Amino acid sequence: MNLQRLSIFGTDNIGVYIYTNNKYTVVPRGLDSETKENIVQILGTELIEAEISRSFLLGIFISGNDNGILLPKSTIDDEFRFLKENLRDCRVEVLNSKVTALGNTILTNNKAALIYPEFNDIEEKIIKETLGVEEIRRGKIAQMITVGSVGVVTNKGGLVHVDTSEKELKELEKLFGVKIDIGTVNFGSVFIRSGLVANDKGTLVGASTTGPEILRIQKALGE
């Protein structure tokens, strides 16, 4: 697995700014050429520079997999049109929900999705249809309801909050169909998503992620 440490805009919280699947990586406008080249090299995707809600916090607002991409209702029309045109192989939908931090509230790979417990039935149906997943479930991870913020799952493996119980791990592995381990990023942060951006081809971690954390990440994501 390709893996590289990275900082963006002077912070190691790279997952706040970047969304990726196996086809596309969406990044903020204004990154330097070297950073963009590194991202493409590690993740092996087409790079798209964009905004959501006139913000660069793309990793917080966007959730998705290889089948579909979900955007918050705060997405502006021209932003939606731009992403719809450029994410050509993915279904792109706006989720009309009071919840806008979709990256923090939906954990998904191509098989399944674990979602924020307070999504309603209509929202759950739209999420399932857009992502094209076989199974969807509302729940928590280590008592945290923002399930997307405390885990990253690909089609090869997953890493979640260090306090996740053995029982929860088994349930998550059954749901997503991959091995899942516990860990931290950026020198002890339990908010996995903020410091880890991964697809089936490569992994980016925040620059302060330690050697032992990286070994755990590589093992968890199918190294």
UniProtKB/Swiss-Prot annotation:
InterPro entries: eIF6. The keyword Protein biosynthesis applies. GO terms for molecular function: ribosome binding; translation initiation factor activity. It holds the Pfam family eIF-6. Belongs to the eIF-6 family. Binds to the 50S ribosomal subunit and prevents its association with the 30S ribosomal subunit to form the 70S initiation complex. This is Translation initiation factor 6.
